[in-house]
């Protein structure tokens, strides 16, 4: 058999081959995959042929944990793996995102910054996030009320989404509640690239009796909107330790609702002022 005959036979066989799937079939398969962020995807049952599917459905509706995702041999199902990767990406994104300056201005907040200059430095040098920049110190001394009963501070922390998502349901009711309780409220402001301990310098600088820091939590897998409140009585840079802080964590729509957290923080501030204590020294 000569070379031309071989090439002709190969060409004929290739032309007779059928594609594995037509574009129509491929599109149909792709359209079957739900949006990974949708409620349908979150409540998806991956267990094949379950005995009582209604029990699994109720379990999936009652928790955000990864239950009922099923297996394919020793491996996770494709959709379960894709959701895992999507949730992981979402958590990374909220750490790296910046709170827009336009959003801060819209809320009418004064903005200051820690000694951190950018997000990369914030993640690699947490010590700098615990201190105010020189410009921030000057700004707070000239534009903020001194010696308040309660100073409310908002900071991005490790979750931008936690601040932008929960702010409207948390901060206005909190300020209103503190005012109705008869407390003198300091000027609320936003600290970019802040860490928890920065509230000690703020309290010492403004001579606040109670400092309430609302800061974005390190995100969990797929949960990027969780906020924490760290409240402390008469903090100082040198003497305040972590045991002096009272923490209310997991503030978001799927945890402690923001509006409910506002009421809890108001009661907490009242107790701190009455007992002149916070953290482990505060009686429940």
Swiss-Prot record:
Gene Ontology MF terms: cobalamin binding; ethanolamine ammonia-lyase activity
InterPro entries recorded: EutC, EutC_C
Top-rank taxon, per record: Bacteria
Catalytic activities: ethanolamine = acetaldehyde + NH4(+)
Cofactor comment text: Binds between the large and small subunits.
Record keywords, A-Z: Bacterial microcompartment, Cobalamin, Cobalt, Lyase
Biological or metabolic pathway of the protein: Amine and polyamine degradation; ethanolamine degradation
Coarse class of the protein's main subcellular location: other
Cofactor: adenosylcob(III)alamin
UniProt function note: Catalyzes the deamination of various vicinal amino-alcohols to oxo compounds. Allows this organism to utilize ethanolamine as the sole source of nitrogen and carbon in the presence of external vitamin B12.
Quaternary structure and partners: The basic unit is a heterodimer which dimerizes to form tetramers. The heterotetramers trimerize; 6 large subunits form a core ring with 6 small subunits projecting outwards.
Similarity remark: Belongs to the EutC family.
Protein's recorded name: Ethanolamine ammonia-lyase small subunit
Source species of the chain: Photorhabdus laumondii subsp. laumondii (strain DSM 15139 / CIP 105565 / TT01) (Photorhabdus luminescens subsp. laumondii)
């Amino acid at each position: 058999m000569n070379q031309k005959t071989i090439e002709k036979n190969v060409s004929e066989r290739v032309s007779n081959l059928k594609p594995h799937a037509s574009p129509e079939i491929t599109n149909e398969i792709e359209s079957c995959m739900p949006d990974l962020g949708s409620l349908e995807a979150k409540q998806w049952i991956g267990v094949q042929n379950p005995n009582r599917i209604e029990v699994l459905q109720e379990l999936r509706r009652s928790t955000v944990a990864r239950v009922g995702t099923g297996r394919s041999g020793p491996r996770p199902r494709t959709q379960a793996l894709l959701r895992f990767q999507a949730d992981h990406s979402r958590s990374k994104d909220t750490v790296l995102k910046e709170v827009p300056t336009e959003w801060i201005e819209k809320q009418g907040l004064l903005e200051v910054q820690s000694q951190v200059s950018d997000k990369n430095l914030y993640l690699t040098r947490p010590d700098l996030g615990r201190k105010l920049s020189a410009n921030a110190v000057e700004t707070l001394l000239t534009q903020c009320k001194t010696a308040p009963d309660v100073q409310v501070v908002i900071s991005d922390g490790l979750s931008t989404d936690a601040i932008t998502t929960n702010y409207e349901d948390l901060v206005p009711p909190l300020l209103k509640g503190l005012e109705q309780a008869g407390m003198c409220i300091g000027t609320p402001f936003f600290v970019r690239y802040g860490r928890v301990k920065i509230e000690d310098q703020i309290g010492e600088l403004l001579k606040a009796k109670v400092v309430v820091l609302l800061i974005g939590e390190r995100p969990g897998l797929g949960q990027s909107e969780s906020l924490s409140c760290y409240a402390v009585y008469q903090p100082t840079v040198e003497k305040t330790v972590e045991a002096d802080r009272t923490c209310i964590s997991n503030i978001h729509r799927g945890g402690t609702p923001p509006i409910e957290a506002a009421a809890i923080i108001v009661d907490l501030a009242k107790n701190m002022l009455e007992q002149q204590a916070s953290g482990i020294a505060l009686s429940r």
